[in-house]
Amino acid sequence: MATKQKIRIRLKAFDYKLIDQSAAEIVDTAKRTGAIVKGPVPLPTRFKRFDILRSPHVNKTSRDQFEIRTHQRLMDIVDPTDKTVDALMKLDLPAGVDVEIKLQ
């Protein structure tokens, strides 16, 4: 029984517009080369919150609150061809998007 090869791509970014644009570009490239794409699946957004004192000396009750949201998407490319791998390697994505690629 032959096992099908699968490429799992995980995208992370602080801006959801950039990540959606990158995901659409990856899906379009993979479909153009004849691969089957599952996704993009939106994963839960991670929130990091920081509380910082406004005053350097007194007024502990006065604080600023900041947060960083990390958006994530997951895609699987099932049974990729050599053309698919070459096209994905040549793909130019925005600088704000972190890409993790696993071959399974």
From Swiss-Prot:
InterPro entries: Ribosomal_uS10 (IPR001848), Ribosomal_uS10_CS (IPR018268), Ribosomal_uS10_dom (IPR027486), Ribosomal_uS10_dom_sf (IPR036838)
A GO term from the CC aspect: ribosome
Keyword Ribosomal protein on entry: yes
GO MF terms, alphabetically ordered: structural constituent of ribosome; tRNA binding
Keywords for the protein's UniProt record, in alphabetical order: Ribonucleoprotein, Ribosomal protein
GO biological process per UniProt: translation
Record bears the keyword Ribonucleoprotein: yes
Matches recorded under HAMAP family: Ribosomal_uS10 (MF_00508)
Subunit structure as annotated in this protein's UniProt entry: Part of the 30S ribosomal subunit.
General function of this protein: Involved in the binding of tRNA to the ribosomes.
Family the entry assigns: Belongs to the universal ribosomal protein uS10 family.
PANTHER family listed in its UniProt record: 30S RIBOSOMAL PROTEIN S10 FAMILY MEMBER (PTHR11700)
NCBIfam families with a match to the protein in the record: PRK00596.1 (NF001861), rpsJ_bact (TIGR01049)
Name recorded for this polypeptide: Small ribosomal subunit protein uS10
Lineage, top ranks: Bacteria, Pseudomonadati, Pseudomonadota, Betaproteobacteria, Burkholderiales
The gene coding this protein: rpsJ
